[in-house]
Swiss-Prot record, chain A:
Domain of life where this protein originates: Eukaryota
Similarity remark: Belongs to the ENY2 family.
Keywords tagged on the record: Acetylation, Activator, Chromatin regulator, Isopeptide bond, mRNA transport, Nucleus, Protein transport, Transcription, Transcription regulation, Translocation, Transport, Ubl conjugation
Gene for this chain: ENY2
GO CC, any one term: nucleoplasm
Family annotation (InterPro entries): TF_ENY2, TF_EnY2_sf
GO biological process, one term: protein transport
Described purpose of this protein according to its UniProt entry: Involved in mRNA export coupled transcription activation by association with both the TREX-2 and the SAGA complexes. The transcription regulatory histone acetylation (HAT) complex SAGA is a multiprotein complex that activates transcription by remodeling chromatin and mediating histone acetylation and deubiquitination. Within the SAGA complex, participates in a subcomplex that specifically deubiquitinates both histones H2A and H2B. The SAGA complex is recruited to specific gene promoters by activators such as MYC, where it is required for transcription.
Glycyl lysine isopeptide (Lys-Gly) (interchain with G-Cter in SUMO2), cross-linked positions: 74
Subcellular location: Nucleus, Nucleoplasm
Protein name stated in the entry: Transcription and mRNA export factor ENY2
Nucleus recorded as keyword: yes
Amino acid sequence: MVVSKMNKDAQMRAAINQKLIETGERERLKELLRAKLIECGWKDQLKAHCKEVIKEKGLEHVTVDDLVAEITPKGRALVPDSVKKELLQRIRTFLAQHASL
Amino acid sequence: MKMEEMSLSGLDNSKLEAIAQEIYADLVEDSCLGFCFEVHRAVKCGYFFLDDTDPDSMKDFEIVDQPGLDIFGQVFNQWKSKECVCPNCNRSIAASRFAPHLEKCLGMGRNSSRIANRRIANSNNMNKSESDQEDNDDINDNDWSYGSEKKAKKRKSDKLWYLPFQNPNSPRRSKSLKHKNGELSNSDPFKYNNSTGISYETLGPEELRSLLTTQCGVISEHTKKMCTRSLRCPQHTDEQRRAVRIYFLGPSAALPEVESSLDNDSFDMTDSQALISRLQWDGSSDLSPSDSGSSKTSENQGWGLGTNSSESRKTKKKKSHLSLVGTASSLGSNKKKKPKPPAPPTPSIYDDIN
């Protein structure tokens, strides 16, 4: 019973993701997020942080994995609340539209 | 698929919220990843730190925000007092007036090129001795003078007349000419100041006459010098010019016509005769290159006297007095200058000369 529920859950998520991509909503949301993050200075803050990290490690020894490990938590934390709220709102309306089908 | 979507509607809000959060986290992660790729590429390509500047230089180039200063911290109207030194006449001119001055001084205009050329040619013919030949070459070349392009072309066609007879760059010729001109300048007390005008007290009657046929000549009230501009100089009126001429040359002297004194490139028989005679002279000196200087000069003078009348008639514009003082310079200048057509008007002046 539990396994089937888990399975159903995963299937549902896959279906929603599929829908997001098919309708192009995911692409739109990504673009919106990008624009908002640049607008609010998230990118500049992160870049400053990047510089510190890179100087610390040395220019030659920087790898993408290092950067991702260092940057992603920071990036997630630095997203302003307003941006987060707006994005979540749009995701919810999308879900509501497609859940009612 | 249909079944699952139907089941979506049955999900409670908390489940939907969880999914929404998940999607959001996914998107943020995507953005972060994209940013990381961007930075990594910038680092590996070496342009990541390009926009960095060290704080010292940042301090140096800080934008200044003070009254009376521009953003670089300079007094913004200091250029008003700037002066430039003209490379041609060595006078210092206010920067805002420099371009118009240079145009006049270098002779880049239509009219001013004539004036400037005449001025330089005059001063060279009368003042210089050794470098006479080279300078004349430069002046008459006119390659650099935009306004006189047409003139230069005409001159080229003139040169066709000369070329078979003589080589203007022949060292022997220039040598003998230099010699002659050196003698001439010693005997010529004429002083010509290019920049300020002419003090007429120092001029002899012949020089005065030739000056007045080529230049405005009106005497300034302030400097007591004669105006060295063209006959049409806008600063003085025809009345003033006439008055000066009457004062110097007597009541018979009228204002010479400007048109006739300008170049007009016609060629008459006396010119070609003069050329032929010069050719003969050239040939003779070719035959005896070891001639002493004195014999050459006598030869030259003899030739000059023989063609004196035609010379002075052709070049009376500015060299008639020279042909009277010393014949050699008229020879030299005539060689470089275009032959001037006989100027029929203003007979009173020219009758005096001839």
